[in-house]
Amino acid sequence: MSVIELKDITMSYGPNRILEHFNLSVEQGTFLTMIGSSGCGKTTALKLMNGLLTPEQGTVCINGTDISHTDINELRRGIGYVIQEIGLFPHMTIEKNICYVPNLYKSPDKAAIAARARQLAKTVGLDAEMLKRYPSELSGGQRQRVGIARALMNSPKIILMDEPFGAVDEITRKRLQEEILRIHEELGGTIVFVTHDIKEALKLGSRVLVMDQGHIIQDGTPAQLLKHPATDFVRRLVAG
């Protein structure tokens, strides 16, 4: 079953056409990584998926429903979203940052929310004592883990990740990659992960999408990209 569908999407920023007649379907349980040249439309596609952008033409469907006919806030409650600049609230403890969305919607069971936050902290590799700290007291890698925990708080079936590990050092990045693979294996769901790092795309993705100038150049497994690159652009990309 396709949980994400972008159908005949056209999208521009001013005079610049970013996506043109763009089509993408993502099946339940897929870990899709998206990679390509700067400005090729990866982030735009991601923002269309959770309604941050509205296409000029075409349809975005989540779980079979055209999102233009749904409550956008309700849609986003069911989608985890992780970006490079995590956007934690500096005046809130880590626990309150993780619990922000359910508290925003005034969920009545505060004890269950707190227990869920502790569980997720453990899931992403954070010690329980860190929940009482503030973002400024954590390293970049730790803050990124908080961002992932916050995205998981509502048990979303879809997680969108836009270069989430781009601002951390190489050792931390590798640890976070292992964590997100483990989380995907444990919790299931569908992940769409934008990256500029081909090694990361090939390591994480069960399916890898290569884009250039608003078009899909190749869509396949990591092995297919490595063994049978569709174009010179893909060949240069996988060669590193």
Language model: regions and residue ranges:
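A short, proline-enriched helix->beta-strand linker immediately N-terminal to the Walker B motif
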Residues: 153-157
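Conserved ABC ATPase "signature" region
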Residues: 110-129, 182
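Conserved ABC ATPase signature
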Residues: 134-138, 142
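ABC ATPase "signature
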Residues: 219-220, 228
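ABC ATPase NBD coupling module
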Residues: 66-80, 104, 110-114, 225-229
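Helix-to-loop junction immediately C-terminal to a conserved catalytic motif
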Residues: 50
